[in-house]
């Protein structure tokens, strides 16, 4: 059983206790830790939407330490990151593998980071199905469709050609932060907080 620390704050109404993750959400910090699955994705999506409602112009920071997980759950987080108004900066702590690497790469341009000793891994989606030949063919085609969609997302956020993305994604590809930066998965490797560029107010483009 995982022990979650409790933080006690003094307020004008007395003491108030938060679990550590809820307290960090108040600072606009969201954690993506462990396998990505539907329940976790629902919580993260809710946090993103809540923080947007609190302040639609202030950055949200997402810390990622995940081996990956369910593609549909990860894409629900990805779509919400793109949907909301605030910039979402991403930071890899530990590892960002599979869907974790996609979320890391999906951060706002110029605000995708990794700590020095993290690792990033990308690969194509996998799956298995037992049943009649026709059903197996249906599921195989779906996996190929998802593979194409994920490749297009990496292409969009890294600036690499689709052909290069397909080559990199063919097998498990592990990278240190420096290689991930050269590949376009992140923008910067940071060792200290002062190196992290977080904008309090998102600069809106003027329509002329």
Swiss-Prot record:
Group of enzyme by EC: hydrolase
Catalytic activity from the UniProt record: Hydrolysis of proteins to small peptides in the presence of ATP and magnesium. alpha-casein is the usual test substrate. In the absence of ATP, only oligopeptides shorter than five residues are hydrolyzed (such as succinyl-Leu-Tyr-|-NHMec, and Leu-Tyr-Leu-|-Tyr-Trp, in which cleavage of the -Tyr-|-Leu- and -Tyr-|-Trp bonds also occurs)
Alphabetically ordered keywords of this record: Cytoplasm, Hydrolase, Protease, Serine protease
Predominant place of localization: cytoplasm
Active site, renumbered: 98 (nucleophile), 123
Molecular function terms, GO-annotated: ATP-dependent peptidase activity; ATPase binding; serine-type endopeptidase activity
EC number: 3.4.21.92
Similarity comment text for this entry: Belongs to the peptidase S14 family.
Biological function: Cleaves peptides in various proteins in a process that requires ATP hydrolysis. Has a chymotrypsin-like activity. Plays a major role in the degradation of misfolded proteins.
Protein name: ATP-dependent Clp protease proteolytic subunit
Organism in which the protein naturally occurs: Wolbachia pipientis subsp. Culex pipiens (strain wPip)
